[in-house]
Amino acid sequence: MPFDARTRPLTAPQARVLATLLEKSRTVPDSYPLTLNSLLAGCNQKSSRDPVMQLTESEVQQALDELRQQTLVLEIGGARVARWEHNFTRGVGVPDQSAALLGLLMLRGPQTAGELRINAERWHRFADISSVEAFLDELQSRSDDKGGPLVTLLPRAPGAREPRWAHLLCGPVDASPVQMASASPASRSEEDGALAQRVQALEDEVAALRATVQRLCEQLGVAEH
């Protein structure tokens, strides 16, 4: 049976762990699946995260164990260190494009369709905003037998040009305009998105280098310092 957020919504740590696995599978495929240490670093990174979290290793491990019970993540046995990968598309029953949008919403919070298209550049290249909106509409109109809607369109905040979308994987969201009153204009969002992409690209390069060093250490049988 598909994942149903209405009866068993994700916790905040579960959503962060799952979304981080989704992100890294697309942005740093050479270092994926992730070790627990790499996953912890990805969950707690400061760029491309809203809110920024400071999860502990035990909290990440607990989230992994809980997600594994729901078949949303899989543990891959390694030579020395266990690695983890998501099973999101099959577990939730959505295509890759929808998985990318949901992952971004879990990592960065509510976003407009335009912001999602910009932020998804390294996840999936959508042809235009209309294609993003088409997948969002599909997620919003998801039937009950498939687990119900997975996103909702929030009311447009005062001063904002466009309404924002939010995911429902953690249950219903507070759609009050007060919560979203700080929404920035589209031009500012594009600038912030471009900067965040550059920072994310650098962090992904560092993560890939760390993963390479870790695998070399595993092959040589030496401890990583």
Curated annotation (Swiss-Prot):
Top-level taxon in the UniProt lineage: Bacteria
* Transmembrane segments annotated in the record for this chain: none
Gene3D superfamilies from the UniProt entry:
Winged helix-like DNA-binding domain superfamily/Winged helix DNA-binding domain
Write down the InterPro entries for this protein, in alphabetical order.
DUF480, WH-like_DNA-bd_sf, WH_DNA-bd_sf
The UniProt family comment states: Belongs to the UPF0502 family.
Protein name per UniProt: UPF0502 protein Dtpsy_2730
